């Protein structure tokens, strides 16, 4: 599946191979790496996992291929992921980080209710959402 983000987004998003490697590394934390598809067409990928230490789910990655951005796929995928986590009910919140300066990511996650929690790490801004 040839997925790629826009050139200006490359510094902010992990390559899909790294996403899969991260899923394997976090397999003990019930990691979930998924391809996002419309019909038979791959439009993106996502990765999330459990984090008992934080009493939260961690959304490690969510990206939509550059050719399909702006069509609502990211919003729909995030809504489905969050609904599944709410139904599961193992943890009360979701935590994510985005690279400082990635205003598109910040705005995207804010529209879905995520708020900065000021537990930032190096050049990454941490946000969370109460389920």
Q: How should each PLM-predicted stretch be described?
A:
Residues 1-60, 65-67, 78-88, 116-122:
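Acetyl-CoA-dependent GNAT
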Residues 109, 114:
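Conserved active-site tyrosine of GNAT-family acetyltransferases
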Residues 126-131:
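Terminal substrate-recognition subdomain of acyl/acetyltransferases
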């Amino acid at each position: 599946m040839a997925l790629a983000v826009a050139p200006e987004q490359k510094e902010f998003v992990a390559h899909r191979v790294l996403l899969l490697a991260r899923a394997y590394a976090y397999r003990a934390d019930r990691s979930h790496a998924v391809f996002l598809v419309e019909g038979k067409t791959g439009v993106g990928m996502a990765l999330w996992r459990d984090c008992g230490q934080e009493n939260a789910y961690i959304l490690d990655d969510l990206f939509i291929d550059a050719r399909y951005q702006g069509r609502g796929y990211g919003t729909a995928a995030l809504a489905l992921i969050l609904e599944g986590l709410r139904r599961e009910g193992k943890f009360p919140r979701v935590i994510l980080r985005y690279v400082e300066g990635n205003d598109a990511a910040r705005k995207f996650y804010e529209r879905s209710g995520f708020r900065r929690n000021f537990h930032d790490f190096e050049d990454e801004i941490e946000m969370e959402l109460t389920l």
